[in-house]
């Protein structure tokens, strides 16, 4: 069962994620502050970015780009 959290993306109480979806300290921050709904919105945006920019997720440069976009999308909207 998921807990309710205050989602900083949605700016309201919402259902939290069931598990940490991203590794490390950033992943913990996302788990504690980003709801399931907001994470799903990010996944849609992420797919769009990967396809439009033809990102290669094996490339560190492309993964770093995607991580920066994720932070911008989730925490600076």
Curated annotation (Swiss-Prot):
Signal peptide: none annotated. GO terms for cellular component: cytosol. It comes from the Bacteria. GO terms for biological process: cellular response to oxidative stress. One of its GO terms (molecular function) is iron ion binding. Keywords: Iron. PANTHER family: FE(2+)-TRAFFICKING PROTEIN-RELATED. Belongs to the Fe(2+)-trafficking protein family. Could be a mediator in iron transactions between iron acquisition and iron-requiring processes, such as synthesis and/or repair of Fe-S clusters in biosynthetic enzymes. This is Probable Fe(2+)-trafficking protein.
């Amino acid at each position: 069962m998921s807990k309710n959290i205050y989602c900083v993306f949605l700016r309201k109480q919402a259902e939290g994620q069931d598990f940490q979806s991203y590794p490390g300290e950033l992943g913990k921050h996302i788990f504690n502050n980003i709801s399931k709904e907001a994470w799903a919105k990010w996944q849609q945006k992420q797919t769009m970015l990967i396809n439009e920019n033809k990102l290669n997720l094996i490339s560190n440069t492309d993964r770093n780009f995607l991580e920066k976009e994720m932070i911008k999308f989730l925490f600076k909207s």
